[in-house]
Each structure stands twice: as structure tokens, then as C-alpha cells.
């Protein structure tokens, strides 16, 4: 069974905690019923702050440094591959990257660049292919050598921000007993760092499996 710790991407702005809890619960109930509420979605944006905003990640098309990062790290390399024929086997992708920069910039406007975030450490040491780079591949806890079963199984539970910090504390407590190596201390330390980083900033995760 797979598992990703999908980070809660928003939290309540100070003073709006109760309303935030009400709105998020109402939206969750509506989604379960296949319904939508644009008004509630808009209100949620106003009373919440994103994880990206919290760590100071700049935005493509809005902040110059993020725009240049997108040009140099995404657009220019991909367009060079397209012109060199490396994308000939994927004609739609080739056509996509051969478009003018301004056109693609408009489509990606507002995209956050975590690599340039003011506060470093938010990206996961291990991430799944179906989630974002800030979501931790929780399934890897199953492969930490010597980790007791109770702490492994807890990975499959949703965690609030406070619970993330507590989980990290308990994992850190057993870290000295874990063997060295990429499937030992290194892997567990990555999980601890991720839990502490986001939990201490007010963000929890939901277990997606």
C-alpha cells in the first residue's frame, strides 16, 4: 500500500481560526456530496494563508527572481530539447515548449518556486510521483530499519500541526537506535526534519493511500 503525507496547503490567518475550521469542514462535506461553493472557496482564500506564502516562496510572473528561475530552469532547457529533436517522439510536448516565453509565462503566472523560498527546508527528502515536492513519501517509513511497528503504523494517520511536532519528537527519541545508512538514520532524519519544519509553522498533513 502506498502512502504520501500530503501537506495541508493552507492554514487560518490569525483571528480567523474558528471561521476557517467551519468553512473547511463545510467545503469537505460538500465535496463528499459532489457539490461546490465558489463563495465559500473565495472566502477561504481571504481567511487563510498558504504554506508557500508562509515560507516566502516567490511567484512566477509576479516576482522577477521567480520569473527568471522559471526561464532558466524550465523554459530554456525544455525549448532547447525541443529544437534539438529530443522531444520528437512527443509532438504535443514539443509544440508546447516551442511557444513564445511570454505565452507560457502567462499560463504559469502565480506558480510558487519553493527552490527560492526565504525559509529553507520545506521540500521533502523523498517525494512521490503523484504529489508535489513538498509532500513526503510516508510509505518510506515502512523501510526504516529497526523502527518499531507502532511508530511505523502511525504514519498512516492524519496529523495536525501539533501532532506532526509530537510525532517528530518521538521519532527523534528513537533515532539513536536506528542503523546508519540511507534506509536507516538518513531516511528517518528526513521525516523528522519535514514534520518539524511544517508542524512548527502551523501545517499538518493528511495520509493519502
Per-segment meaning from a language model:
Residues 1-201, 208-209:
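Acidic (Asp/Glu-rich) sequence patches and key acidic residues
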Amino acid at each position: 500500500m502506498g502512502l504520501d503525507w500530503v501537506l495541508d496547503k493552507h492554514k487560518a490567518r490569525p483571528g480567523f481560526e474558528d471561521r476557517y475550521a467551519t468553512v473547511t469542514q463545510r467545503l469537505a462535506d460538500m465535496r463528499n456530496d459532489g457539490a461546490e461553493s465558489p463563495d465559500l472557496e473565495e472566502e477561504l482564500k481571504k481567511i487563510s494563508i498558504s504554506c508557500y506564502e508562509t515560507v516566502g516562496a516567490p511567484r512566477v510572473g509576479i516576482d522577477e527572481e521567480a520569473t527568471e528561475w522559471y526561464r532558466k530552469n524550465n523554459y530554456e532547457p525544455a525549448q532547447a530539447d525541443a529544437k534539438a529533436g529530443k522531444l520528437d517522439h512527443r509532438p504535443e510536448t514539443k509544440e508546447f515548449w516551442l511557444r513564445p516565453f511570454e505565452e507560457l509565462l502567462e499560463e504559469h503566472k502565480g506558480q510558487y518556486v519553493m527552490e527560492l523560498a526565504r525559509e529553507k527546508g520545506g521540500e521533502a527528502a523523498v517525494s512521490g510521483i503523484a504529489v508535489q515536492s513538498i509532500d513526503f513519501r510516508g510509505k518510506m517509513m515502512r523501510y526504516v530499519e529497526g523502527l518499531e511497528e507502532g511508530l511505523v503504523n502511525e504514519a498512516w494517520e492524519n496529523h495536525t500541526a501539533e501532532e506532526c511536532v509530537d510525532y517528530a519528537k518521538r521519532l527523534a527519541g528513537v533515532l539513536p537506535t536506528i542503523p546508519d545508512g540511507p534506509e536507516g538514520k538518513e531516511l528517518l532524519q528526513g521525516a523528522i526534519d519535514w514534520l518539524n519544519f511544517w508542524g512548527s509553522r502551523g501545517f499538518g498533513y493528511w495520509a493519502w493511500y
